[in-house]
Amino acid sequence: MFVARSIAADHKDLIHDVSFDFHGRRMATCSSDQSVKVWDKSENVNWHCTASWKTHSGSVWRVTWAHPEFGQVLASCSFDRTAAVWEEIVGESNDKLRGQSHWVKRTTLVDSRTSVTDVKFAPKHMGLMLATCSADGVVRIYEAPDVMNLSQWSLQHEISCKLSCSCISWNPSSSRAHSPMIAVGSDDSSPNIMGKVQIYEYNENTRKYAKAETLMSVSDPVHDIAFAPNLGRSFHILAVATKDVRIFTMKPLRKELSSSGGVTKFENHTVAQFDNHNSQVWRVSWNITGTVLASSGDDGTVRLWKANYMDNWKCIGVLKGDGNPVGNSFQGIFGSSIGSASHGLQNSVNGTSTSGRKHS
């Protein structure tokens, strides 16, 4: 059974994002109070705030961890039109701060002219790369050519999406059969604009990102988007948080059916669509195997979704904002799966305060 622990975050305004590190033992939160806090889990499983600092001059929308292979590195993005990269430094043995850690700003990315609404590190097999998206509809991809020098980042790609961007997700697949891919969601409120999820794929020939797909069935504002971890699947699974929860599969068509040397074409299917939240859905997050999806909405609940052996998705559990299960929703369903979902689940639980974001 999942055990809920309430954390007094002590932010002075709305918490917009919660992010766990690779091992699930560190957590970062960000808020409209312009600060980021880092939390560490102790041996008794309690969370303690080990760092808190003012990061931006506006609301901080998102915070994300780099893979630990690159050190203890965070990125944040803000209404102040910037993204920032932070690194944790531990005092040297001859330092009066011996053994104590503090976070240092390594760079500020200032290319956007509007609010930077999301920031995500690329999968580690791509090297130390970072993507941002902005309200002006531009996705920017940066690279740190020297992973030992995080003050130097070069802008590698600019992708114009033509719609205001609210969220991005890298495809985590490390298979050589899959080119690097990034999904972009738009929170444009115009009901006349269809296709508020766009998929961009890296083309080795042109060395640029090109639009591979537009999910035309998504016409409502998108708040979050997440590719599922790909453990040997030949297709991709994408979750979308909008006025409901949607799960899509993207099956690559054979190369001879795609344009020669061009982007991959996909056969897309909506495999699940749930309006159980009866409200806006703000966050979606997968467990590490890509088999359980957690979603959080303005109804104050986190809902867990899983497919059965027939690939039919259904709700397998509901948690209220205080972490308690609703009714007997978990009984006899989970076995060990809930533990594997807990990181994404906690992420969603804490993300329920995201309603009303995008204001300074």
UniProtKB/Swiss-Prot annotation:
SUPFAM superfamilies: WD40 repeat-like
Family in the record: Belongs to the WD repeat SEC13 family.
Quaternary data: Component of the Nup107-160 subcomplex of the nuclear pore complex (NPC). The Nup107-160 subcomplex includes NUP160, NUP133, NUP107, NUP98, NUP85, NUP43, NUP37, SEH1 and SEC13. Component of the GATOR2 subcomplex, composed of MIOS, SEC13, SEH1L, WDR24 and WDR59. The GATOR2 complex interacts with CASTOR1 and CASTOR2; the interaction is negatively regulated by arginine. The GATOR2 complex interacts with SESN1, SESN2 and SESN3; the interaction is negatively regulated by amino acids.
Cellular component GO terms held in the UniProt record: GATOR2 complex; kinetochore; lysosomal membrane; nuclear pore outer ring; Seh1-associated complex
Keyword terms, alphabetized: Cell cycle, Cell division, Centromere, Chromosome, Chromosome partition, Kinetochore, Lysosome, Membrane, Mitosis, mRNA transport, Nuclear pore complex, Nucleus, Protein transport, Repeat, Translocation, Transport, WD repeat
Regulation: The GATOR2 complex is negatively regulated by the upstream amino acid sensors CASTOR1 and SESN2, which sequester the GATOR2 complex in absence of amino acids. In the presence of abundant amino acids, GATOR2 is released from CASTOR1 and SESN2 and activated.
Spans of repeat WD: 10-49, 55-96, 111-152, 160-210, 217-258, 276-315
UniProt-listed PROSITE patterns: WD_REPEATS_2, WD_REPEATS_REGION
Annotated compartments: Chromosome, Centromere, Kinetochore; Nucleus, Nuclear pore complex; Lysosome membrane
Pfam families: WD40
Gene Ontology MF term list: structural molecule activity
Protein name: Nucleoporin SEH1-B
Highest taxon of the lineage: Eukaryota
Main localization category: nucleus
Function: Component of the Nup107-160 subcomplex of the nuclear pore complex (NPC). The Nup107-160 subcomplex is required for the assembly of a functional NPC. The Nup107-160 subcomplex is also required for normal kinetochore microtubule attachment, mitotic progression and chromosome segregation. This subunit plays a role in recruitment of the Nup107-160 subcomplex to the kinetochore. As a component of the GATOR2 complex, functions as an activator of the amino acid-sensing branch of the mTORC1 signaling pathway. The GATOR2 complex indirectly activates mTORC1 through the inhibition of the GATOR1 subcomplex. GATOR2 probably acts as an E3 ubiquitin-protein ligase toward GATOR1. In the presence of abundant amino acids, the GATOR2 complex mediates ubiquitination of the NPRL2 core component of the GATOR1 complex, leading to GATOR1 inactivation. In the absence of amino acids, GATOR2 is inhibited, activating the GATOR1 complex.
One GO process term, biological-process aspect: nuclear pore organization
